[in-house]
């Protein structure tokens, strides 16, 4: 599985893939999870945070999207700032070096697979790889509270921004996660991700920071 970076600079190269991506989001969030407020007549799940500022990481295997994630600069409107501000006691994070992660998914047929690294781990490691590459120092995430131990177990330093609250019947919290070398190397080693996975097609002009030396621990 390779993870493609899609930004405003190369979005035209991925028009067809993005169309599939938004339809997969509809299937997962509207049909499977029942978020009917996101339903649209065109069968795509697109919200107010799918702007030109959004960055998409799409995991592709044999030309099929199997995992995805959206990243939004916290200097722009985010889920935390505009929908769930009550989850951050000190107010939503707004920093040029921090992005919000959202719409993180793996398609049903790839969930829980055991042949090699799981798609879930690859897409999350790709987020850390992207953050390091462009010089970020933090991610914010609005998530169901049961996710917290899993983040810690994969080597991420996740700090709650407030107290968990019941949202639509689910205990939900907001966290800030450090983006650093240890977080990327940690998830790769703990989840058997074999190093860098990002494809920067059409983004050759983007200045990227070097990644730390990586060695798989067997």
Swiss-Prot record:
InterPro entries: Acyl_CoA_acyltransferase (IPR016181), Autoind_synthase (IPR001690). Gene3D superfamilies: 3.40.630.30. Pfam families: Autoind_synth (PF00765). GO terms for biological process: quorum sensing; signal transduction. Its EC number is 2.3.1.229. It comes from the Bacteria. It is an enzyme of class 2 (transferase). Catalyzes the synthesis of 4-coumaroyl-homoserine lactone, a quorum-sensing (QS) autoinducer molecule which binds to RpaR transcriptional regulator to regulate expression of QS-dependent genes. Belongs to the autoinducer synthase family. This is 4-coumaroyl-homoserine lactone synthase. It comes from Rhodopseudomonas palustris (strain ATCC BAA-98 / CGA009). The lineage of its organism: Bacteria, Pseudomonadati, Pseudomonadota, Alphaproteobacteria, Hyphomicrobiales.
């Amino acid at each position: 599985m390779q993870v493609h970076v899609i930004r405003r600079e190369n979005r035209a190269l991925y028009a067809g893939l993005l169309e599939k991506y938004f339809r997969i989001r509809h299937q997962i969030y509207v049909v499977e999870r029942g978020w009917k407020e996101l339903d649209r007549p065109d069968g795509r799940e697109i919200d107010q945070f799918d702007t030109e500022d959004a960055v998409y990481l799409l995991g592709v295997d044999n030309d099929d999207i199997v995992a995805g994630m959206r990243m939004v600069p916290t200097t722009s409107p985010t889920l935390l700032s505009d929908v769930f501000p009550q989850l951050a006691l000190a107010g939503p994070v707004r920093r040029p070096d921090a992005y919000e992660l959202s719409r993180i998914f793996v398609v049903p047929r790839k969930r829980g697979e055991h042949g090699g690294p799981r798609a879930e781990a690859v897409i999350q490691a790709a987020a850390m790889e992207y953050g390091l590459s462009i010089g970020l120092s933090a991610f914010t995430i609005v998530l169901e509270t049961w996710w917290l131990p899993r983040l810690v177990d994969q080597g991420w330093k996740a700090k709650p921004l407030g107290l968990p609250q019941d949202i639509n019947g689910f205990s939900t919290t907001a966290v800030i996660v450090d983006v650093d070398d240890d977080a990327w190397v940690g998830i790769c080693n703990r989840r058997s991700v074999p190093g860098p996975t990002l494809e920067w097609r059409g983004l050759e002009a983007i200045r990227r920071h070097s990644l730390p030396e990586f060695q798989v621990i067997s």
